[in-house]
């Protein structure tokens, strides 16, 4: 049998004009010459590669990918070429294909540091934070001083709520290079851990490097607010707005401060400037609380028509309808009292090791107090408790997730938006402990940022003058909303240790004061869609 004839490959002399055109930046000429040569040498790896480089240099990414893939069809073992294809695909927003190319690169050449990094970045952009972290860790193993990989690893660890690990990685990165953004990220992680003083220090380090860093002033203002340093926090919000008058979060944070301190006119101005998060609902709140009912009703109807799943809007709509005797036609959660759920957490009942460990960790954990204007004779933790490193807090978070499934199952037949659009994937927007002493109570409020909220009870007063001392009370009225009558329903629930009470975040709730010289400890949380 006759042997197949191997097609001739171009010589170095023949490809030299293409190389010269590329090296001198004459990309159009290089493209033209390579395209012409491919007619003569259609199976020449080197010519397809040069053609791809000429196209890529002109930002003809789609055609460049096709050219490189033809080269790889001839020789698929060239890791660098798979890497180049990955970069081009990423530029074309073809993320899955880019990830496949980077994975092929590192399988062919495990020591290719930049490929591990790019793979991590592509996975991070898709929200695949655990996989991204693994890729960044491989890049750092190969190059321990890879600053960008360390920074991004810190970010994805923070996204996964691994705050202590993220802080350690940021500290490693800062040993390599002092960077304002890294100090900012670390400050945010420290704040979420409840380490408010350390967060302030990190933010100040960021400002030393970048004195006009508006976001840092705004975030540090929030930390000082949590520490009860209200005048200083306002000064920082204003400093942020000097640096960037349009910064949404600074306008919003200043508005929240004014809102909480009773300056509703000032709050309204800054909410409307911010156009951030739930600014429209909070603007309506300001109008309602100042009895501007006509303006409120007009804005309410406009917002109801376009936003069908807002818990805060449900509070405002429901209260207005009940207050003025009109129909509540907002179907998010028109009857929130029906969705109160009182049950046990089995892991906290009886002689519970978890309960004892939680009480110990609450006593010993390095968590700073968050000032809470509605709380009387008590302290509230700062940060996000379920995101801390202590095993007991994380285990309690898992217990809550199991109860949430029971909660969903219990109300699965209901037809309102609150149930029908209950988040399939969720996160704990916040979680904290509250310790109260004699006379302790929490005034009526809602949780504006949550979908569903709850409280678990770890220690309760037993020496009561009446059965509902220390109980939680839920109602469709509270927070000193304007009231035209006294017919709003209310219900008191007396939990026992190891119980959990869950309810829509849009429902008013408060703690009834207790008189005994005992301690009441609960862990509260807000759940929101991811």
Segments (PLM) and residue ranges:
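Catalytic core of non-heme Fe(II) oxygenases with the double-stranded beta-helix
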Residues: 391-394, 398-401, 405-502, 512-530
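Conserved alpha-helical positions within TPR/SEL1-like repeat arrays
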Residues: 19, 23, 46-57, 80-91, ...
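Non-heme Fe(II)/2-oxoglutarate
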Residues: 326-420, 441
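Alpha-helical protein-protein interaction scaffolds
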Residues: 219, 225-228, 240-323
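Structural marker of alpha-solenoid helical repeat scaffolds
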Residues: 40, 74, 108, 142, ...
């Amino acid at each position: 049998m006759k042997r197949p004839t191997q097609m001739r490959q171009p010589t170095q002399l023949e490809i030299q004009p293409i190389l010269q055109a590329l090296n001198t930046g004459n990309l159009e000429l290089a493209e033209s010459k390579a395209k012409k040569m491919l007619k003569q040498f259609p199976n020449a790896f080197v010519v397809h590669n040069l053609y791809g480089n000429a196209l890529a240099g002109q930002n003809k990414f789609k055609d460049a990918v096709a050219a490189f893939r033809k080269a790889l069809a001839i020789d698929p073992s060239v890791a660098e070429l798979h890497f180049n294809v990955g970069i081009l695909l990423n530029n074309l927003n073809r993320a899955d294909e880019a990830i496949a190319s980077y994975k092929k690169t590192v399988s062919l050449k495990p020591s290719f540091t930049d490929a591990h990094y790019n793979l991590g970045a592509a996975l991070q952009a898709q929200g695949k934070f655990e996989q991204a972290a693994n890729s960044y860790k491989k890049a750092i193993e190969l190059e321990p001083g890879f600053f960008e990989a360390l920074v991004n690893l810190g970010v994805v660890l923070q996204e996964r709520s691994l705050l202590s690990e993220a802080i350690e990685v940021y500290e490693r990165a800062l040993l390599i290079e002092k960077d304002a953004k890294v100090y900012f990220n670390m400050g945010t992680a420290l704040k979420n851990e409840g380490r408010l003083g350390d967060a302030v220090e990190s933010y100040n380090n960021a400002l030393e490097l970048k004195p006009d860093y508006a976001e840092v002033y705004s975030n540090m203002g929030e930390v000082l607010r949590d520490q009860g340093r209200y005048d200083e926090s306002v000064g920082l919000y204003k400093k942020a707005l000097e640096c960037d008058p349009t910064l949404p979060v600074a306008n919003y944070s200043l508005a929240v401060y004014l809102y909480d301190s009773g300056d509703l006119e000032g709050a309204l101005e800054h909410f409307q400037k911010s156009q951030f998060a739930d600014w429209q609902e909070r603007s309506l709140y300001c109008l309602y609380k100042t009895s501007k009912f006509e303006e409120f009703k007009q804005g309410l109807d406009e917002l109801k028509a376009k936003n069908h799943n807002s818990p805060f809007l449900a509070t405002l709509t429901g209260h207005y309808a009940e207050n003025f005797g009109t129909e509540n036609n907002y179907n998010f959660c028109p009857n929130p009292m029906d969705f109160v759920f009182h049950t046990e957490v089995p892991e906290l009942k009886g002689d519970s090791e978890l309960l004892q460990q939680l009480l110990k960790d609450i006593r010993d954990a390095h968590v700073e107090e968050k000032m809470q204007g509605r709380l009387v004779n008590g302290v509230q933790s700062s940060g996000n408790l379920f995101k801390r490193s202590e095993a007991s807090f994380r285990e309690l978070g898992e217990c809550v997730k199991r109860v949430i499934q029971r909660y969903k199952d219990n109300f699965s037949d209901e037809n309102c938006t609150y149930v029908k659009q209950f988040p399939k994937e969720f996160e704990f927007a916040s979680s904290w402990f509250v310790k109260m002493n004699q006379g302790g109570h929490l005034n009526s409020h809602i949780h504006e940022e949550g979908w569903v909220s709850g409280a678990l009870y770890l220690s309760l007063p037993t020496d009561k003058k009446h059965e509902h001392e220390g109980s939680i009370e839920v109602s469709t009225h509270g927070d000193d909303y304007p009231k035209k009558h006294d017919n709003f329903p209310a219900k008191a629930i007396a939990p026992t240790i190891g119980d959990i009470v869950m309810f829509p975040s849009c429902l008013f709730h408060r703690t009834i004061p207790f008189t005994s010289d005992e301690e009441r400890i609960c862990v509260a949380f807000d759940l929101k869609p991811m």
